[in-house]
Amino acid sequence: MSKTYHFIGIKGSGMSALALMLYQMGHKVQGSDVEKYYFTQRGLEQAGITILPFDEKNLDGDMEIIAGNAFRPDNNVEIVYADQNGISYKRYHEFLGSFMRDFVSMGVAGAHGKTSTTGMLSHVLSHITDTSFLIGDGTGRGSANAKYFVFESDEYERHFMPYHPEYSIITNIDFDHPDYFTSLEDVFNAFNDYAKQITKGLFVYGEDAELRKITSDAPIYYYGFEAEGNDFVASDLLRSTTGSTFTVHFRGQNLGQFHIPTFGRHNIMNATAVIGLLYTAGFDLNLVREHLKTFSGVKRRFTEKIVNDTVIIDDFAHHPTEIIATLDAARQKYPSKEIVAVFQPHTFTRTIALLDDFAHALNQADAVYLAQIYGSAREVDHGDVKVEDLANKINKKHQVITVENVSPLLDHDNAVYVFMGAGDIQTYEYSFERLLSNLTSNVQ
């Protein structure tokens, strides 16, 4: 039966994906959010989903209301109105926990690589059989007839605790979100609690020391590069400018050669996890092999464009581990070019907690440009850290730039520009693109 859904904060990456999925399943969907443009709204607008400004008049007691986790009585008029008038609503993760019970569900959790791996699993499985999915880049697909549901499982504030999927991948465990988690042990405990809720199969990266300590009532399968101690092993790697080719073995049995048109060692691991899960779930590996070849990636994860013969890469990387992986991927695809990193730190708490790690990661580039720290709506800038503190720890050529003046980026020949961050780093990218376009116009 068709329902009407209202999303409070519809432009959020998970919220927009869920809105699209429910819309495609035949439901009426609308939502509210701030006016500022966010990359997720393009898909919503293309689907004809109405995006309204926040207003208590948007709410109707006959709607099913889903509220983004960032919106609370102290910062949102719709939440206040709902609370005062007894209008019920569910948080995103609460709704998702009940929704997935109607499917064979497959989650992807982990500190890094969730979105790319969810996208890869969704792409392959939806080409094999009818599948609904939610990807953290704002992409969602819904089918009323789907048996399978693939989703991204987020650890922040332990939002994944309502989830009880049949299968799940955990890509890694790392200390992040220092505004919520108190330590690596705290992060581990959250993932370990989640692991206990998996019912049929848990697939974890076997070369992560923290993941080796995970326990679950479901069978645990380890994947990795090392033959010893892992169930699914990727070997015979061939990394080229067109992607990566590798062989997978399962407990000594050769499952064949696979190719992905994406870059970086981390994507080989993501693919190995997907292969392991789908093999264990009983899917034809020839079909898995065929559809891995056509996976082109997800939004804001190594997204490339060429402006005035200049290669520009946009990536969501905002943690040192992610920066290293992104720069590794750039070097694989462009081995003869200078790798120029343009990075915007995201949140003051993360920058303080991981300052030395950020410097180490950024030193993998040939040159580094830094934007001002992007503060989260969840925090206040107490002046404890400035972007210059990070700049002082970088030993490659570096400079702090402003969005109004990105011309220092022109000081490079034969370079690839890698813009990274989870804030508004794209405004710097667009400023640079305009500069490049103007140079062409002036020459002509």
Curated annotation (Swiss-Prot):
Keywords: ATP-binding, Cell cycle, Cell division, Cell shape, Cell wall biogenesis/degradation, Cytoplasm, Ligase, Nucleotide-binding, Peptidoglycan synthesis. It catalyses: UDP-N-acetyl-alpha-D-muramate + L-alanine + ATP = UDP-N-acetyl-alpha-D-muramoyl-L-alanine + ADP + phosphate + H(+). It comes from the Bacteria. Gene3D superfamilies: Mur ligase, C-terminal domain, Mur-like, catalytic domain, NAD(P)-binding Rossmann-like Domain. Its main location: cytoplasm. Its EC number is 6.3.2.8. One of its GO terms (molecular function) is UDP-N-acetylmuramate-L-alanine ligase activity. The keyword Cell cycle applies. One of its GO terms (biological process) is peptidoglycan biosynthetic process. InterPro entries: Mur-like_cat_sf, Mur_ligase_C, Mur_ligase_C_dom_sf, Mur_ligase_cen, Mur_ligase_N, MurCDEF_pg_biosynth, UDP-N-AcMur_Ala_ligase_MurC. Cell wall formation. NCBIfam families: murC. This is UDP-N-acetylmuramate--L-alanine ligase. It comes from Streptococcus pneumoniae (strain ATCC 700669 / Spain 23F-1). The lineage of its organism: Bacteria, Bacillati, Bacillota, Bacilli, Lactobacillales.
